[in-house]
Curated annotation (Swiss-Prot):
Subunit structure: The system is composed of three essential subunits: KdpA, KdpB and KdpC.
Subcellular location: Cell inner membrane
Any one GO molecular-function label of the UniProt entry: P-type potassium transmembrane transporter activity
Its membrane topology: Single-pass membrane protein
Key words of the record: ATP-binding, Cell inner membrane, Cell membrane, Ion transport, Membrane, Nucleotide-binding, Potassium, Potassium transport, Transmembrane, Transmembrane helix, Transport
Full protein name: Potassium-transporting ATPase KdpC subunit
GO terms for cellular component: plasma membrane
Keyword Chaperone: no
Primary residence: membrane
InterPro entries, sorted: KdpC
HAMAP family for the chain: KdpC (MF_00276)
Transmembrane segments: 10-30
NCBIfam families attached to this UniProt entry: kdpC, PRK00315.1
Length: 183
């Protein structure tokens, strides 16, 4: 029996070392050399180097002076991130959307963009379409006492246009840039 067990244990040990130690160390080393920012979580830092968040995970911003992220079904908690799984016919979904739209509605701005009242699949999408960010510009400019044009220019300068897919604005990066604006 030991004759059969020995090769199995040796295989287990070798494969455990290769797949559990060598391969992860190799991939981590390559990632740190080739993509250090992404390998470390795409962290955003303030002027003093303090980590404020990740470009990859949405944060909740309350108050009129901030651009708001998409609603989150899991209250922006990474542990419980998920979609709401409410069917379009569910009255609870219609009530939540109506409530969120009423909170986001700005007079004379037209209908609230869909991205500001619907949750994403993960509940943690950090980006908004540029239209949703521009929709909030008047509220943010008024609350901060800034010229509307300055805030609109900030949205435009933070609009990312990937090679594939629609243009997006990272809400955390945009709000970080807002803190640097002077009245």
């Amino acid at each position: 029996m030991f004759k059969q067990l020995r090769p199995a244990l040796a295989s287990l040990l070798v494969l455990s070392l290769v797949t559990g130690v060598a391969y992860p160390l190799l991939v981590t080393g390559i990632a740190q050399l080739a993509f250090p920012e992404q390998a470390n979580g795409s962290l955003l830092r303030d002027a003093e180097g303090k980590v404020l968040g990740s470009r990859l995970i949405a944060q909740k911003f309350d108050g009129e002076e901030w651009f708001h992220s998409r609603p989150s079904a899991g209250d922006y908690a990474t542990v419980s991130s998920a979609a709401s799984n409410l069917a379009p016919s569910n009255p609870a979904l219609a009530e939540r959307i109506a409530r969120d739209a009423a909170q986001e509605r700005i007079a004379d701005q037209g209908p609230v963009p869909l991205a500001l009242v619907t949750t994403s699949g993960s509940g943690l999408d950090p980006q908004l379409p540029p239209q949703a960010a521009r929709y909030q510009a008047l509220r943010v400019a008024t609350a901060r006492g800034l010229p509307l044009r300055l805030v609109e220019d900030l949205v435009e300068s933070h609009t990312e246009r990937p090679l594939v897919g629609p243009a997006v604005v990272n809400v955390l990066a945009l709000n970080m840039a807002l803190t640097g604006l002077k009245r």
